[in-house]
């Protein structure tokens, strides 16, 4: 740029550029790095002024024999912390640069053609599956009275075939499955199958053995011994 009273020249110099392989943090250039702007004027006085305008940045302005020089440098006491997303991207790029040719090819293949398992585990599919489970639960939810009737009907049906240990221990459990929806399962403690419905011959078999300590040095033993009629 030409001026009638002199020549104006602006120059920028960066001595120590930021190293891109730094993975942990993002910092300003070191204290030896500088950016200077130099201009020439026809008349001027000798002066030197230093101003620290922002944390980590100092600006010096020098006027010597008609030459104005402005120097901006990093004081080394200020750092910029990257966001988690920037850290992840920087780490990914750093690892990709250090990969071999076949590793890069394999990575590119996985990005372009993701596996079936990766597609299934996507956030959209997970959200859809959860919604499906909630809908199943809403459609299959029953009242407490209905649950008691379910338990009573099951006990009545099983009593024709087995001897139930205790009706009070019968439990109704409700669970949710991703593919099947809401599952109702009933736990019934059974003492034994009734003789007329037994699949094997239990003649002479001892079952339901119980031990009771009498606290006088002896033990009472009770058991069932099946003798067919």
Curated annotation (Swiss-Prot):
This is Cell division topological specificity factor homolog, chloroplastic. Its main location: plastid. Residues 142-169 are annotated as: Homodimerization. GO terms for biological process: cell division; chloroplast fission; regulation of division septum assembly. Belongs to the MinE family. Changing residue 129 to A: Normal interaction with MIND1. It is found in: Plastid, Chloroplast. Disruption phenotype: Only one or two large plastids (all type of plastid) in each plastid containing cells. Impaired gravitropism of inflorescence stems and hypocotyls, but not of roots. Wide variation in size and shape of epidermal plastids, occasionally displaying grape-like morphology, associated with a disturbed localization of FTSZ1 ring. Severe inhibition of plastid division, producing motile disorganized dots and short filaments of FtsZ. Reduced number of enlarged etioplasts in cotyledons associated with fragmented FtsZ filaments. Homodimer. Interacts with MIND1. These interactions are required for proper intraplastidic localization. Binds to ARC3. Changing residue 126 to R: Normal interaction with MIND1. Pfam families: MinE. Keywords: Chloroplast, Plastid, Transit peptide. Residues 1-30 form a transit peptide. One of its GO terms (cellular component) is chloroplast.
């Amino acid at each position: 740029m030409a001026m009638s009273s002199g020549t104006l020249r602006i120059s920028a110099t960066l001595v120590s550029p930021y190293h891109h392989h730094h993975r942990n943090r993002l910092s300003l250039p070191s204290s030896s790095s500088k950016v200077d702007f130099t201009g020439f004027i026809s008349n001027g006085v000798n002066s030197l002024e230093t101003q620290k305008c922002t944390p980590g940045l100092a600006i010096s302005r020098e006027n010597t024999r008609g030459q104005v020089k402005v120097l901006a440098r990093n004081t080394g006491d200020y750092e910029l912390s990257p966001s988690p997303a920037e850290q992840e991207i920087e780490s990914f790029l750093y690892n990709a640069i250090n990969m071999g040719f076949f590793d890069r090819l394999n990575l590119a293949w996985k990005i372009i053609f993701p596996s079936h398992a990766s597609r299934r585990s996507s956030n959209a599919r997970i959200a859809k599956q959860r919604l499906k489970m909630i809908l199943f639960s809403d459609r299959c939810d029953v009242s407490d009275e209905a649950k008691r009737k379910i338990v009573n009907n099951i006990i009545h049906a099983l009593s024709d075939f087995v001897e139930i240990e205790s009706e009070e221990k019968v439990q109704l459990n409700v669970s949710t499955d991703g593919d099947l929806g809401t599952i109702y399962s009933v736990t019934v403690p059974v003492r034994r199958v009734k003789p007329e419905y037994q699949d094997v011959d239990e003649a002479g078999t001892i079952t339901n053995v119980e031990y009771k300590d009498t606290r006088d040095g002896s033990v009472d033993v009770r058991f069932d011994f099946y003798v067919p009629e």
